[in-house]
Design a protein with these regions (language model features):
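Extracellular/lumenal glycan-associated context and N-glycosylation machinery
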Residues: 1-66
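Intrinsic disorder/low-complexity segments enriched in polar/charged and small flexible residues
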Residues: 6, 19, 127, 141, ...
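Short, exposed beta-strand "edge-strand" segments with a Pro/Gly-rich flavor and a Y/T-containing core
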Residues: 4-11, 223, 291-293, 359
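Short, structured coil/loop segments at alpha-helix boundaries
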Residues: 13, 31, 35, 103-104, ...
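Acidic, low-complexity intrinsically disordered regions
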Residues: 13, 33, 121, 135, ...
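An amphipathic, basic-hydrophobic helix/alpha-beta surface used to engage anionic
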Residues: 47-293
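Acidic, glycine-rich A-domain
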Residues: 259, 273-378
Length: 378
């Protein structure tokens, strides 16, 4: 009842109930004794109560809330939330309480008390909200509340201020990753009659030498030629693996344990950005998006991804790195693929059948994910 009154009219505060009781008592005493001064006291009390009912809602009428866009962050960092409250009324507003109605998965509503906003002025409120997990979070409203000027009645009103906050998954700082580095070694071994594998797409073969440009990887500098010419020369690479790109695919249409799936998303983000740092052509596949490329697009897709997605796209038939919890899917991987397998906690260890045709990693949730992604594949 109190909530209904506060959001649609006004609800008495503790002081309001006390004054209301006193006014009724004086009015009753005046009826019994016919004393004029009792009527005066009760009349003044009722007048104050009437003002206390009218003024709080009126003080909120001229307030407009605008919200600034929220910059994306990585899980574990703080969201920076900024709101501006404009006072368009002809008189100042005082003793205001502002509450940002966050979604419950992000945190509890955040409150701020504002002493005064002058006529035609604005108040900027900036706060930082911690994040723990990735996701795309949306919320719509900001709640304004006041009991000014008398504090006898309290009212609250909602203002529309829709916003979206994007929290990217964590990216592990991988220093090496055999899943990426050794991708394509089997194919290049079969294609070389001398038994020496060709370079992978991350390395290639030297086509020609050119002057060094700022931003070129140091590993591409040809030191002998640079010493001969007296300037840095860089190898231009001819990619040998037929232009293959590495596709990191998450089995998002399958059933997952929630914690395993969150680890898989972190692994996908870490593998993607490791390959990107190695200047390898890389893409991400999910059941809902299909194949996507580009840092921002991939980050947003991984922020929004969920398991048991209703996707119509099938995994590509080219070699890929398959992240899954279902070992039965490993038997249908394309040639040259790799896999990363999480075990369902409800499945006993001896019941898990792993496909040994392709190398991969079986994740132990008790160990560091970063360490396991950096170890040699089997």
């Amino acid at each position: 009842m109190t909530n209904w009154l506060e959001t649609r009219a006004c609800a008495p505060a503790y002081g309001g109930w006390i004054l209301m009781g006193i006014a009724i008592c004086f009015f009753g005493a005046g009826i019994n004794t016919m004393a004029g001064w009792l009527y005066v006291i009760s009349g003044v009390s009722f007048a104050l109560l009437g003002l206390a009912v009218i003024l709080p809602p009126r003080s909120l009428l001229g307030l407009v809330v605008k919200r600034l866009p929220i910059e994306p962050v990585t899980a574990g960092d703080d969201l920076t939330v900024e709101l501006e409250i404009f006072n368009q009324a002809r008189q100042p507003t005082s003793l205001l309480q502002v509450q940002d109605m966050l979604p419950f998965v992000l945190g509890k509503p955040i409150q701020k008390s504002i002493e005064r906003i002058s006529h035609g002025k604005s108040y900027r409120w900036v706060y930082h909200q911690p994040t723990e997990r990735r996701g795309i979070f949306r919320w719509q409203t900001v709640e304004l509340g006041t009991g000014a000027p008398l504090g006898l009645f309290w009212c609250r009103r909602l203002r529309d201020a829709a916003v979206m906050a994007v929290v990217y998954p964590k990216v592990l700082p991988l220093t090496t990753c055999p899943l990426i580095d050794e991708m394509g070694d089997e194919d290049s071994q079969r294609g070389d009659p001398r038994g020496r594998p060709l370079q992978t797409a991350t390395q290639g073969l030297t086509r020609c030498l050119r002057p060094y440009h700022i931003g070129d990887p140091i590993r591409l500098i040809h030191w002998r030629t640079s010493a001969r010419y007296g300037e840095l020369r860089v190898r231009e690479l001819e990619v040998i693996t037929g232009g293959q790109e590495i596709i990191i695919a998450i089995d998002s249409a399958g059933n997952w344990n929630e914690e395993n799936f969150e680890q898989a998303v972190i692994a996908a983000a870490s593998l993607y950005f490791y390959a990107h740092r190695q200047q390898t052509q890389v893409a991400l596949w999910t059941a809902s998006t299909g194949i996507i490329r580009g840092k921002r697009v991939v980050q947003e897709a991984l922020a929004a991804i969920a398991f048991q997605e209703d996707g119509t796209t099938k995994p590509p038939h080219s070699p890929l790195i398959w992240l899954t919890q279902n070992p039965l899917t490993l038997s249908s991987l394309p040639n040259g693929s790799r896999w990363v397998l999480w075990q369902d906690v409800s499945t006993e260890q001896e019941q898990v059948i792993v496909n040994k045709d392709y190398p991969g990693i079986q994740i132990d949730t008790e160990q560091s994910l970063q360490t396991q992604l950096q170890k040699c594949i089997r």
